[in-house]
Amino acid sequence: MEEEGYQWARRCGNNAVEDPFVYEPPLFFLPQDQHHMHGLMPNEDFIANKFVTSTLYSGPRIQDIANALALVEPLTHPVREISKSTVPLLERSTLSKVDRYTLKVKNNSNGMCDDGYKWRKYGQKSIKNSPNPRSYYKCTNPICNAKKQVERSIDESNTYIITYEGFHFHYTYPFFLPDKTRQWPNKKTKIHKHNAQDMNKKSQTQEESKEAQLGELTNQNHPVNKAQENTPANLEEGLFFPVDQCRPQQGLLEDVVAPAMKNIPTRDSVLTAS
C-alpha cells in the first residue's frame, strides 16, 4: 500500500496537495478487504461530509448553539429575580454606610467650631427623651446636596453630635472664596500705623484745647482774681464815664442843647468836691 501511495503522489504531483477535493485523497485508500472496510466504516458518505465540513468551518454549528441555549436559558430566570431584589438593598446599604457619618465635636469659648463650609438652617425638631432639640442644616452652595444634623449631647453639655449626609462637591470657603473684608497682614499693619498717628495727633490737640479752656475757667473763678475785680478803682470805672466821652463835641448840637445839660459829673470833679 505504501508503494501505491508513493506512485499516486508521483503521478499527481503537487496538485493533489493543493486541491485534495479534485483528486481522491490518499486518506480514503483503504485495505482491499471489503468486509473489513464495511465493519470499520459502515457509511462512507457520512465520513466524507464530516471531513469536508471540518475542513471548511471548524467553529460551533447552529444546532450546537441552540442546544447550549436550551440548556442554559432555564437557569437565567432565577438569577434575574435575585439581582432585581438584591440591587436596591445593596444600594441602600452603601448609602447608609458611606454617605452618612456621625462626629462628636467639643465647642470652644466662641461657640461650635467651624468646619469650613457655610450652612443654612432650615428646620428644628424636638427629640423624644432628650431635652435638647435637633437642628437641620443644608449647604448654601447650589451645586452641593450635603446636609447635617446638630444636637447637643445629653451626657456632656459642651459636646455636639453632628451627623453629616452626603458629600461636598466644592472646596471649603476660607480657601476657595476669601472674605472681601480681609486684607493681607502687611497692608493691615501699615494702615493701622497711619491711623494711629492721626488719632494720636487729634487726641493731643483735643486734650490741649480742653486744658486751655479749663485753665481759663479756673483763672476766672479763682478768688484772687475775683478780689482784684472788686477793687475801688474798678468800681469807679464802672460808675463814671471816661473823660474823653465827657468832652464837649464840636458840631451843631452845641446850638441846640442847653448849657445846663452839658454839666455831666466826672470822676475828677467828684474827687475835688469830696
Curated annotation (Swiss-Prot):
It comes from the Eukaryota. The keyword DNA-binding applies. Its main location: nucleus. Residues 188-228 are annotated as: Disordered. It is found in: Nucleus. The keyword Transcription applies. Residues 195-213 have a biased composition (Basic and acidic residues). Keywords: Coiled coil, DNA-binding, Nucleus, Transcription, Transcription regulation. Residues 216-228 have a biased composition (Polar residues). Pfam families: WRKY. InterPro entries: WRKY_dom, WRKY_dom_sf, WRKY_plant. GO terms for molecular function: DNA-binding transcription factor activity; transcription cis-regulatory region binding. Residues 193-222 form a coiled coil. Residues 108-173 bind DNA. One of its GO terms (cellular component) is nucleus. Belongs to the WRKY group II-c family. Transcription factor. Interacts specifically with the W box (5'-(T)TGAC[CT]-3'), a frequently occurring elicitor-responsive cis-acting element. This is Probable WRKY transcription factor 49.
